[in-house]
């Protein structure tokens, strides 16, 4: 199946079904993924309120932050050390700290998104360096896994970062 990226690059990509993992993969995988996430049109890396769509997106994001915290609290109680992978502009990291009183940390490869997070007082790391194995109670990936080149490797990595009995919360579209 061929699809077009109407948002950023206008490129055509082919989706190939992986019967082992039961998911579609983009082929060929673009060499420079960074350019897709540094675009002004990549909405999850902005806090824009310019258009009606931007305002609606920010309202939905605000609602979802509360829902995500509530969801995690159903499964984990007490002092929680949480890592948010693909933290965007840091809103979930900040919400977890301010409203749930968790110890939070975020990973975000986009320099632009990390800068926006920093403007809000949220410090995010660019990568996984300095993270110790078995050091998190909860790891979240909100619409991130579908952007990862090697899903199996990512899941194994997350598993290694979780404490025994830890919780991985992974949301993907559809």
Go through the PLM ranges and name each one.
Residues 1-52:
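N-terminal juxtadomain amphipathic helix
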Residues 36, 40, 59, 63, ...:
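Residues that form generic nucleotide/phosphate-binding pockets
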């Amino acid at each position: 199946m061929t699809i077009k990226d109407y948002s950023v690059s206008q490129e055509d990509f082919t989706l190939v079904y992986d019967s082992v993992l039961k998911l579609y993969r983009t082929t060929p995988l673009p060499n420079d993924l960074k350019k897709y996430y540094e675009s002004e049109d990549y909405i999850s890396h902005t806090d824009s309120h310019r258009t009606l769509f931007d305002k609606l997106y920010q309202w939905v994001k605000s609602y979802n932050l509360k829902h995500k915290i509530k969801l995690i609290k159903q499964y984990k109680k007490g002092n929680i050390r949480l890592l948010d992978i693909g933290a965007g502009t840091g809103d979930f990291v900040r919400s977890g700290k301010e409203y749930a009183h968790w110890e939070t940390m975020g990973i975000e490869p986009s320099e632009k998104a990390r800068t926006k997070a920093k403007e809000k007082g949220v410090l995010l790391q660019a990568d996984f360096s300095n993270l110790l194995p078995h050091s998190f109670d909860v790891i979240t990936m909100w619409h991130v896994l579908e952007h990862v080149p090697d899903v199996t490797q990512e899941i194994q990595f997350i598993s290694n970062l979780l404490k025994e009995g830890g919780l991985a919360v992974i949301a993907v579209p559809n």
